[in-house]
């Protein structure tokens, strides 16, 4: 049996329990409710985040194991309310959301939450389109198949973004042919 196969059946009873904290090198992963400020504080261990990038559920589009989301705005307000104390004053928040269609039209389900974010001092700094390039197969009820999602960008004040990360291999040949010669075009 190939351990990399995708047909592995998950256990009937989950191994991870709420409160489990996993230390993964410099990273930390906590099984908890993001609306719980104490859990968020435990995860960050005294640090404050520069960036929160998340992809929450899109409205009440799916039936999760919890039975769905009764109030999407309340869920989002709880999550971002708890996050406030965990973020630096110059933090950036990016939230990936997709379209939801009901009654044969797309729904601006995010409007109430976006206004709530503004009332909490978060500016609508940017609104981006994530081009996913590959169309998702399926019956789209006469609409073109979606190939994008939105990314909403909030902040309290402008901060020039650091768009680069130092590269360990800068200046080194990393793409060599089997014979050891360089693939770099010179």
Regions found by a protein language model. Give the residues of each.
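Core catalytic lobe of class I
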Residues: 1-186
